Amino acid sequence: QDPDTLDTWFSSALWPFSTLGWPNENAEDYNYFYPTNTLVTGYDIIGFWVSRMIFSGLAYTGKAPFDTVLIHGIVRDSQGRKMSKSLGNGIDPLEVIEQYGADALRMMLIIGSTAGNDMRYSDEKVLACRNFANKLWNASRFVQMNLPEDFEPGLPAEDLLDMSDKWILSELAKVAAEATANLDKYELGLAAEKVENFIWEVYCDWYIEICKTRLNGEDAAAADAARKVLVYVLDKALKLLHPFMPFITEEIYQALPGSAETIMNEKWPGDENMKVWAEDCADFEKLMDYIKAVRAMRAEMNVHPAKKTSMVIETASPAAFEKGGAYLARFAFATDVTVTAKYEGSTDGMVNVATPDAKGFIPMMELIDRDKELARLNKELTKAEKELGMFTNQLNNPKFVEKAPAKLVEETRAKLAAAQDKAAKIKES
């Protein structure tokens, strides 16, 4: 052994302070950067490197080089194997970036990571993140195409906000607070996933679609309010997403009215005191649940969107459905809506659509082939009753309940409850 050679891990252990001018403890870089806050590294080198940095720092400077260590897992291949030259299962990041984009690869790695756990790489996961980037890009283009040249950003007065505006602003406040809390706990994957879900499922799939009614309507004030909220929420969403997808967020941000020199210097939305309208949110979510149920029922019965019909809604929350008439017309394909606390009229030829907060009576039989629909329902009922019998027999068997894994028993009970619910709904309809 060469006495003048320092083992690689021991030389690496000196890195936190030896690169900053040490042993000159008056060096500017040393005083500014040492000690630092957080070290991010893999679990495979805790003993080799992390522990050596800590005891070397304490021994030579009297201070630990960092106060927090965030341990992440290893990126493995789609089969869970460690990537190696011998297996030939490694990836070239530059090739992935060329095909899917740097943001997509970055987002996939962040969403797939949980502290200390390994993750599996696959092109399909990167493709899903690229699809999200495309969704965001197209949504942003839609917003920009609907802005007049003299558009002034900023939220409208509260009395100009409708139920959907208050809902999206409240959801924005919630996701900003949740993502901030996740980041404070180093839960990057959870934070990124929540921001992605907000942008895709809440902003794109619901709010943008809802805004089209006002943007294409005759009420200029309502259209302007929708534009202002669209831009405001997009601006904040881009800032929330920026740490995870920096390139596309900067590009879109620069195209927004009133943007600064760079999104990187903008204030983090989670630090703002954004308002939540709890009552309006609850009302709007009741409306959304009902619309989803109607659309699912129509899809199941193969009813074309062009075929619209009247509906009666029985509910203890009439305000939500009375305020949402325009949304029911557009998204639940209603020609007219009657809201009542108790429906006592004829249900002949009607289909029931039930949610926790409402029951809809819809004359669907006039839009479909009655005999064909009855045959479909009977087939579904037979299947549900068969499942009912199978799960009931399993749970009535003492040997199964006693010897099967507890998780399997719970899953069987859940399947039985689902089959019971399905059979009851079919009979009710």
PLM segments and residue spans:
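Feature 926 captures the class I aminoacyl-tRNA synthetase adenylation module centered on the KMSKS loop
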Residues: 1-10, 14, 59-98, 102, ...
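Reverse-transcriptase-like RNA-dependent polymerase core
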Residues: 15, 19-23
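The substrate-binding groove and active-site-proximal loops of carbohydrate-active enzymes
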Residues: 35-45
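Aromatic-rich carbohydrate-recognition surfaces in CAZymes
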Residues: 46, 96-98, 104-110
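Alpha-helical support elements that line or immediately flank enzyme active sites
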Residues: 47, 52-60, 195
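A glycine-rich, basic-preceded beta-loop-alpha segment at the flavin cofactor/substrate interface
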Residues: 110-111, 175
